[in-house]
Amino acid sequence: MNTGRGVGRVVVLSGPSAVGKSTVVRCLRERIPDLYFSVSATTRAPRPGEVDGVDYSFVTPEAFQQLIDDGALLEWAEIHGGLHRSGTPARPVREATVAGRPVLIEVDLAGARAVKQAMPEALSVFLAPPSWEVLERRLVGRGTETPDVMSRRLDTARTELAAQSDFDVVVVNSQLESACSELVSLLVGHTSAGTNPA
């Protein structure tokens, strides 16, 4: 049902591992009650504290392949050199935008490019660290990956940082509150089909 607000704004959020995407997303969900947060399907194992259907939809590789075969994903990609796959279910995103809700899609770099290609009206936002040193410290401090996986994540982060100019907006996550406020403005301050102020 359309709320009369026009089509909801779609913001595609990306950035390197450990830049604080999950923390920023939690802040946005608290500050924007009507926000539709796209829950990605993934074949990776849950991290401590992650909830199936809330943080991600954790699926088997076979179930993920079926989603691809059915054309049910807006985008999908192999992550960190093929360690796992992740993708965005298309139908819930489209339903939320038609209902006039702001939509947040958190994806990796390849996913952001694919969503932007499929939905050119979406606003792509890169969440950047204050510096490489801060990002490296955050990644290593997590302690959730093996040294080999950590090396891959650092390589991926370098690639992603180099591509931030491909995004519509770059938000530096030096302080949570300012990063969250900037993203709130982007999500609720714009609609792709709203009234034009006189």
Curated annotation (Swiss-Prot):
**Catalyses which reaction(s):** GMP + ATP = GDP + ADP
Q: Does the keyword Nucleotide-binding apply?
A: yes
> What domain of life does the native source organism fall in?
Bacteria
Name where it's found.
Cytoplasm
Give the matching InterPro entries: GK/Ca_channel_bsu, Guanylate_kin-like_dom, Guanylate_kinase, Guanylate_kinase_CS, P-loop_NTPase
The answer to whether keyword Kinase applies is: yes
Guanylate kinase-like domain mapped to chain residues: 8-188
Q: Which GO terms describe its cellular component?
A: cytosol
**Family annotation (HAMAP family):** Guanylate_kinase
The name on file for this protein is Guanylate kinase
Origin species: Mycobacterium sp. (strain MCS)
Which gene holds the coding sequence for this protein?
A: gmk
